[in-house]
């Protein structure tokens, strides 16, 4: 592994950081999350058309940039520093890999250029509140999370006219505003139970999308209800796809990207805290000069740097084809963000507890991401189970 960033990677980080410093401060973030879409559409247009962010990690043949998960993780680290609300996670990290892995050539050719230009955003809808299970992050995703042949979840039924969907999906990131939905649905009953992926365009009859009130306002979520909705199968009819395996692979790469994003947020909130303790005075001296405060900040610094190393390795390893590395990096990064943001609230004193200060936004990001993709102990438990660390027998290599 070469830990040195290339000139192109450094340019991605530098350009994105400069843009976000100008256009995505705390007040801009608060304004953006109150908008109908939940993000700044003008900023998203700039990110798409000038920086090529939505198409960063897919081939140039479809209008993308042709980079890898590594570059996408580095870009997400910068977005995490400012908590920039955007459809990047839902579109480029969770949805595009599904289209690349399972979609037909016609579907890729029709949709990917529009995604790369920023014209089209996408979201992944899985039944109930099982996003972390569906992505294989905290458990085996070959279970009954998609419905399992019972009532509930999302059911797919084949008719003379095509496929029809019925059910409900919660925790759909950017589901209220996405122009394209990738829906995981159960079909086949008990005898031939399987999970398939379907495409739904914006405005499809029978689809109800409601934006939910979430703990982390910078990470918009929606509930999607489907009532006998006509849908298009992702991929070719008659072909058999390992949907669970593809979702687990997407979950692994998404975890690496999310780990980098969390590291960016933790690094920024630590920077702000260090700046503050140098200015705030007690007993005639800056509180940052007290040994106890120095020790706390030093511990936070070590934790953030360790999480950064894990996140960078996960991004590199995922791009190189390694599996089951993202979950552990995500666990370490989420823990670092939670501890750093909670310490930031305390070290900022009275102002850290106010709505006006941005410290609470970072704490909510940490808590919200653990609810969506964790919790940390289950991420680690699943990684240990996958490696057979405590089950006896030979340890998987």
Q: Which residues fall in each region the model found?
A:
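A structural signal for short hydrophobic beta-strand segments in well-ordered beta-sheet cores
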Residues: 154-156
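A generic structural signal for well-ordered coil/turn residues at beta-strand boundaries
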Residues: 120, 150-152, 177-179, 193-194, ...
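N-terminal glycine-rich flavin-associated loop
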Residues: 86-106
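A short, Trp-centered hydrophobic/proline-enriched beta-strand micro-motif
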Residues: 118-137
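Flexible, small-/acidic-enriched active-site or ligand-binding loops
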Residues: 136-142, 171-172, 201-236
């Amino acid at each position: 592994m070469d830990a040195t960033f290339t000139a192109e990677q450094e340019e991605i980080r530098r350009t994105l950081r400069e843009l976000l410093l100008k256009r995505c401060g705390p007040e801009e973030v608060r304004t953006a999350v109150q908008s109908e879409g939940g993000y700044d559409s003008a900023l998203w247009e700039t990110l798409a058309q000038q920086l090529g962010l939505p198409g960063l990690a897919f081939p140039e043949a479809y209008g993308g940039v042709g980079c890898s998960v590594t570059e996408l993780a580095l870009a997400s680290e910068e977005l995490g520093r400012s908590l920039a609300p955007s459809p990047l996670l839902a579109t480029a990290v969770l949805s595009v890999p599904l289209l690349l892995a399972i979609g037909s050539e016609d579907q890729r050719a029709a949709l990917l250029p529009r995604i790369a230009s920023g014209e089209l955003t996408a979201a992944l809808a899985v039944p109930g509140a099982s996003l972390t299970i569906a992505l294989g992050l905290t458990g085996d995703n070959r279970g009954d999370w998609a419905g399992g042949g019972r009532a509930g979840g999302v059911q797919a039924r084949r008719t003379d006219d095509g496929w029809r969907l019925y059910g409900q999906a919660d925790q759909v990131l950017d589901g209220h505003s996405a122009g394209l939905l990738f829906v995981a649905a159960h079909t086949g009953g008990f005898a031939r139970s399987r999970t398939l992926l379907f495409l739904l365009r914006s405005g499809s009859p029978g689809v109800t999308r409601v934006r939910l009130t979430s703990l982390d306002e910078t990470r918009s979520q929606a509930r999607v209800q489907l009532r006998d909705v006509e849908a298009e199968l992702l991929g070719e009819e008659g072909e058999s796809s390992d949907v669970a395996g593809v979702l687990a692979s997407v979950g692994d790469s998404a975890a690496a990207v999310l780990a980098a994003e969390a590291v960016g947020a933790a690094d920024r909130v630590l920077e702000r805290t260090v700046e503050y303790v140098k200015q705030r005075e007690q007993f005639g001296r800056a509180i940052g000069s007290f040994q106890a405060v120095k020790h706390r900040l030093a511990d936070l610094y070590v934790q953030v740097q360790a999480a950064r190393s894990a996140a960078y390795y996960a991004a590199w390893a995922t791009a190189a084809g390694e599996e089951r590395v993202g979950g552990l990096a995500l666990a370490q990064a989420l823990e670092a963000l939670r501890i750093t943001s909670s310490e930031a609230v305390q070290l900022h004193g009275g102002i850290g507890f106010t709505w006006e200060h941005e410290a609470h936004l970072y704490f909510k990001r940490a808590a919200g991401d653990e609810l969506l993709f964790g919790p940390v102990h289950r991420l680690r438990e699943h990684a240990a189970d996958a490696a057979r660390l405590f089950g006896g027998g030979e340890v998987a290599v």
